[in-house]
């Protein structure tokens, strides 16, 4: 038997160990400190609320305040008030062709309305900044704030909005050329925006960055700045407690020791979940999603970097049957994992049954079965050295990107997510497919070279190159085009009216934002977190903001 085992050739990936060790196992929270900060925040919150709801304030000033609150990461405190104000302003049907409104103002209002799902059209309001040939006026290069605002607004575009496509090209080139000559904090803001677009960014990372910028503003409001800093630190304390909880759970499972071939990335999994929802009311949802991502990561590595095809045949059947009796048939090394997976879902079901939502686990399990079937197909392609046509590859790869499953599990702990939402996701609606496409093609671009080095030929890039007689560079360009079009679809699907709550729609949007952050610079930040994710994790979960 030992000799037989020795003869098994496994496609090991030799993943790097966790960067964090036991750093987050220890819980150093201080209830007294948290309570003191909470009380201060409540006082400041009332001050800010008064600013927001004050009568007689000009629309332009109120919209600028809403934009500042959102950028500082504190708008969730005033969700209801902001929705009401934006609805009232939207109903005014403001004539933005009035010369009283400059480019900065018009673009900011357009972006804020679109971010909240209001169908404001772009053709009517940006036309006056173009010449008779339809080109944007060169003189706009003297208006850095206006350019930046238009640049950020253009990322809210939908299909067919060529004026926003052109605006993005024009503002990108213009901002790159003028950035070195700007004064900070505007220069810093422009340089950051060119690397990380506001609409595609992780809200917590963007909040921390903007707090440091806002501190440099000459016209900053000191109460608002203090409120944002304290709120950031208080949320960080909550997130650290949750990270402590999932780190302890992960350590007690001891799957890292039992399955040393797999990536040990529970901290990065929590970072992912926190990007989907950071607000206090989603605490349970974050923990549940983190656990499902961590378990999926092990399944992925088992198919991709360890299991033989015979072992994977048995494991696929065991997941399909979803029964503890299946453990008898499984290879020894995967038994502890299978048991832990079934027990995790039993805990979920028990928890959700208390609120009459145990049905949610059924949808999650069915989605996991679909994911595992697709992993199995991919593993067989690898073993056989089969390179499928791009259409066949993509059909399977949209499932193996894991976002079908993780969009579903992101709603497990969201109390407002109802059966109709899970049913909607199970039918692969347009918004979900757009999300799957972004996840798939951006992942494929980032992992292509590493997978090629490991002998993996059934990659999206290879398949597209062969089908279209394309070079690697042409394939990558096409994949970015696919992602950009998918973002347009997501923007469209976030518009009102929608049969689904923004609570649900924002989960899909935020899952895509995490892709943009994690694979920034065409790097696989999840597998190799040192360069891309480590600085973010330190800023979000280790270092508080100095008050």
Curated annotation (Swiss-Prot):
Cell compartments where the protein resides: Plastid, Chloroplast
Expression by tissue: Expressed in leaves.
Entry EC no(s): 4.2.3.-
Pathway(s) where this gene product acts: Secondary metabolite biosynthesis; terpenoid biosynthesis
Keywords associated with the record: Chloroplast, Lyase, Magnesium, Metal-binding, Plastid
An MF annotation (GO) of this entry: terpene synthase activity
Protein's GO biological process: diterpenoid biosynthetic process; green leaf volatile biosynthetic process; sesquiterpene biosynthetic process
Cofactor remark from the record: Binds 3 Mg(2+) or Mn(2+) ions per subunit.
Catalytic activity entry: (2E,6E)-farnesyl diphosphate = germacrene A + diphosphate; (2E,6E)-farnesyl diphosphate = (1S,2S,4R)-beta-elemene + diphosphate
Major place of residence: plastid
Pfam families: Terpene_synth, Terpene_synth_C
Cofactor(s), names only, from the UniProt record: Mg(2+); Mn(2+)
Binding site for Mg(2+) 1: 300, 304
Domain comment quoted from the record: The Asp-Asp-Xaa-Xaa-Asp/Glu (DDXXD/E) motif is important for the catalytic activity, presumably through binding to Mg(2+).
Protein name, entry field: Germacrene A synthase
